[in-house]
């Protein structure tokens, strides 16, 4: 469960940072692929961004960790992400 929390916090901090008032749709597609698709589907979602081999390998390792989470947990992480991204609080500059 710690990995789920870590992944969620990292993704949400990127999505809700004051530097990114508009979220790249491609990023959200990659996030969804990370949580919901097969490893090959996730790797395919990265291709348009031309990650180097080191970055792609790191992403693949992350995907393998995410895949150890129960399906219900991954679905709930997607729901949590959507809830936060659509919240009025996400448009504010929150400091933790």
Swiss-Prot record:
Q: In which tissues is it expressed?
A: Club cells (nonciliated cells of the surface epithelium of the pulmonary airways).
Q: Which GO terms describe its cellular component?
A: cytoplasm; extracellular space; nuclear envelope; secretory granule
Induction behaviour:
By glucocorticoids.
Residues forming coiled coils: none
Give the residue range of the signal peptide: 1-21
| Membrane-spanning segments | none
One GO MF annotation is: phospholipase A2 inhibitor activity
Domain of life, per lineage: Eukaryota
Kindly list the places in or outside the cell where this protein is found, as annotated in its UniProt entry.
Secreted
Biological process per Gene Ontology, one example term: negative regulation of interleukin-5 production
What InterPro entries does the record tag this protein with?
Answer: Secretoglobin (IPR016126), Secretoglobin_1C-like (IPR043215), Secretoglobin_sf (IPR035960), Uteroglobin (IPR000329)
List keywords of the entry alphabetically. Answer: Disulfide bond, Phospholipase A2 inhibitor, Secreted, Signal
Per the record, the major location class is: secreted
Q: How does it assemble?
A: Antiparallel homodimer; disulfide-linked. Interaction with LMBR1L is controversial.
Q: Give the similarity note.
A: Belongs to the secretoglobin family.
State the function annotated in the UniProt record: Binds phosphatidylcholine, phosphatidylinositol, polychlorinated biphenyls (PCB) and weakly progesterone, potent inhibitor of phospholipase A2.
Protein's name according to its UniProt entry? Uteroglobin
Species: Mus musculus
């Amino acid at each position: 469960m710690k990995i789920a929390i870590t992944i969620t916090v990292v993704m949400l901090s990127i999505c809700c940072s004051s530097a990114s008032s508009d979220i790249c749709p491609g990023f959200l597609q990659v996030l969804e692929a990370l949580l919901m698709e097969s490893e090959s589907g996730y790797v395919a979602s990265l291709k348009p961004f031309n990650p180097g081999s080191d970055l792609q390998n790191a992403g693949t390792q992350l995907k393998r960790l995410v895949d150890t989470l129960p399906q219900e947990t991954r679905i709930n992480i997607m729901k949590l992400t959507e809830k936060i991204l659509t919240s009025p609080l996400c448009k504010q500059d929150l400091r933790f």
